Structure formats: structure tokens, C-alpha cells
Amino acid sequence: MALYCRDTLIIIFQKLTVADLARASCVCKVWNSVATEDDLVVSAFTAPWRIKELVGRPASVSFWRDNGIWKFAISHRICRGDSVTSLAVKYAVQVMDIKRLNNMMSDHGIYSRDRLLIPISNPEILANTTCYVELDKYAKREVAVLYLEGAPKREQPVPGTNQQSNLSADGKRRLIESLRRSMQVDDGTALYYLAIAEGDPRSALSEFSADLRWERQAGLN
């Protein structure tokens, strides 16, 4: 009956991987109650990467099914002059991997965000760190996020969400659609430039053109 003793099961399950814990939870109710305990699951999830602490809990339990390196990411706060290419070089990752992780269709999608998630290229960077389980609103996925600067800052509003305008909802939609076609970018990027131009489409196009010129001069395209 030792395999039904809770204390014995905890000692055994502490040595299991995430996948093995999932299998153990299917054996019987007793095993399930132990194998799904938060402490055991978190320990198994973080153990391969030697993470010191995992803060937060995912909205979906399916998050725990896989603890591959792709479940972790670095949070990079966007600064003026950043581009997907320059960040790929900085963090030694592929451009397509950044775009895929962040659910970006074009490089200009960077301008509609206050941060990007950067894939982990060197697992050693996770050792003895604190990661935060977050649902990224742009990437539309839950990830364990590492903040190289120490801790997450209070979330900033999405550019353009607090802009006041006399346009109707339909008028705004048409304006954004027109800018999107002119700039050949996604809606988020068009909305960003419209926001920093305080609703003036001509100024938005000028700002966008200025950024493109800067990128070309800096050799980032």
C-alpha cells in the first residue's frame, strides 16, 4: 500500500519530469491528487532550467504539459530605433523566430507594441532567475517571461487606445484602413502612427516615412 501513501508518492513524484507527472496523474484519484499539486508541477516545470522562482499561475492547465525552452522568453522594452533585425542580432536569435513568437505579420508590427518577447537562445541565462507567467496580449499565448532588468513594470497602455476623436467608429475604421493600405502595414502599426500624430493622417504618414528613412540609413532593412 506504499504506493497509495501520500508522503511516499510525493517523494517519488518529486523526481519525475512534467510528462511523467502527467502520466502519473492518470493512474488513479490518489495519484492524481498528488501529481497535480502546484508545488510538484512547478518544480518539475522549472527543474531542467534551474529557475529559482516561477511567479504567477497560468490561466490554462495545459501550460504545464510542456516545459520546452520555447515556453520561456525574454521581455524587451521597445526603444526608438529598435527593429526586429537589430533585436535578432542583439539576442542572437532568428528574425522569423521573433516574429513567430510575437504573432507579427510584418517587421513594422514592432511600432504598435511597448515590448517584444525574445526567444531564449542560451538556456543558461535562465539559471537562478525569476520568471513570470504571463498571457501576452499581442502574442496571444502564455509564456514564462524573464525580465533582464529585474522585475516587470506596470503595464503601459497600448498606443492609441486612449486617444479622443470626434470620428465615429466607422470613420475611425475607414481612416485606419486607408493608412494601412498607404503604409502597407498591419492595423496595429497604422493605429500607432495615427496615435503619435494625434489623429492627423498626414502627420502619421510623415512620421512613418521618417522612420523608414532612418532604418534605411542605419542599414536595418
Curated annotation (Swiss-Prot):
Name the residues that span the membrane. Answer: none
Q: Which superkingdom heads the taxonomic lineage of this protein's source?
A: Eukaryota
A Pfam family cross-referenced in the UniProt record is LysM
This protein's domain notes: The F-box is necessary for the interaction with ASK proteins.
Q: How does it assemble?
A: Part of a SCF (ASK-cullin-F-box) protein ligase complex. Interacts with SKP1A/ASK1, SKP1B/ASK2, ASK4, ASK11 and ASK13.
Record's function text:
Component of SCF(ASK-cullin-F-box) E3 ubiquitin ligase complexes, which may mediate the ubiquitination and subsequent proteasomal degradation of target proteins.
Q: What's the protein name?
A: F-box protein At1g55000
Organism (species): Arabidopsis thaliana (Mouse-ear cress)
